[in-house]
Structures are given as C-alpha cells and as structure tokens.
Design a protein with these regions (language model features):
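Membrane-proximal amphipathic alpha-helices
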Residues: 41, 45-56
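N-terminal leader/signal peptides at the extreme start of proteins
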Residues: 1-15
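Internal alpha-helical transmembrane segments of multi-pass membrane proteins, especially GPCRs
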Residues: 15, 21-24
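Alpha-helical hydrophobic helix detector
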Residues: 23-38
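Residue-level signal for short amphipathic helical patches enriched in basic/charged
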Residues: 14, 32-35, 43, 47
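Conserved short-loop catalytic and cofactor-binding motifs
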Residues: 40, 47, 76-80
Length: 165
C-alpha cells in the first residue's frame, strides 16, 4: 500500500499544535527569566558589598599599621593633634619617612598602593572620622584620619546603611 500523504487540513492542525507548544515554552521561559533577573541583581549587590568590606578593611588596616609605627616611634609626628593617625588617606598612599631622616637607613613606607574606589559611589572618595569626632559622626573634624566609611546612602542586603559599616 502506498504511503498516505497528509491532507491540508491535517497539516494545519499539526502546525497549530506546535504553535501552541511554542507559546507555552515561551511563557515558561519568561517566567523563569523573571525569577532569575532579581537573583542576578541580588548577586551583583552582594559582590559589591564584599568589595566594600574588603576596601574598608584594607584602609582600616593601613590606618592601624600607621598608628603602630607612630606608637613604636618609627614615625615622628610634629602635630600633637594627630594623636598618632595620618592627616589624610593620601598620606598613606604617598608614604612617610620611617626612622631618622638624617640616617642613611631611613626609608619611605607606603601603607596603601592607592585609595580604593567605593563600589557603590564609583568614586575614590570616603567619609572620614578623626579621633576627636564622635563614633557616629558624619562630619570630619580634619585633625586626622581615625576611621573611614562609605558615602553611599543605599541600604545593604541586611537592611543597614553602607555608611554605618
């Protein structure tokens, strides 16, 4: 018996069925995509938060290291108001002379390679606190750099503000 060819109306029913299947598949993909996009945004924010934590820890460690050198007498400060802390973050980048400046053994030590960029503001600008400022103050007294914080007003994933980290 010869093979039967599909009739035109049977062909149209088959193609209609595949069109419905295509539409269902597209709807399923759209639903999955709508679930993935917020997760991707959340993941990107989490990565930026991690970079912020690392940058803050790096700068705070550099400030502490500077203070340690002053306390050990390796860095001589002429201004008593500095309380053993650097005047600016740039001082940590440019470096300070350690030891007796007249001695051939003196050397310049840099505590930071560069001031890191705040991942949420996109700038290498940070809020600064001096030793004389209140712990929660957002205005810098300018005497020294005791602490740094983000200038971002955005809320973190844990519902705190980045400037409070």
């Amino acid at each position: 018996m010869p093979p039967r060819l599909a009739s035109p109306e049977r062909l149209s029913r088959q193609s209609g069925l595949s069109y419905i299947e295509l539409m269902v598949a597209l709807v399923v993909l759209a639903v999955l995509a709508s679930a993935v996009i917020p997760l991707a945004r959340w993941d990107e924010k989490r990565r930026r938060e991690e970079r912020l934590r690392v940058h803050l820890a790096t700068m705070r460690q550099a400030i502490d290291e500077y203070k340690k050198y002053v306390d050990e007498g390796l860095i001589v400060q002429s201004d008593v108001e500095q309380m053993g802390y650097p005047l600016t973050l740039e001082e940590l980048v440019e470096g300070v002379e350690v030891g007796d400046p007249n001695s051939p053994d003196s050397q310049t030590i840099r505590f930071l390679r560069k001031v890191p960029e705040d991942p949420f503001t996109g700038e290498a600008e940070w809020g600064l606190r001096s030793y004389q400022d209140d712990w929660d103050s957002n205005s810098w007294g300018g005497e020294n750099v005791y602490d740094v914080y983000s200038l971002s007003d955005i809320r973190a994933l844990d519902d705190t503000y980045y400037k409070d980290w």
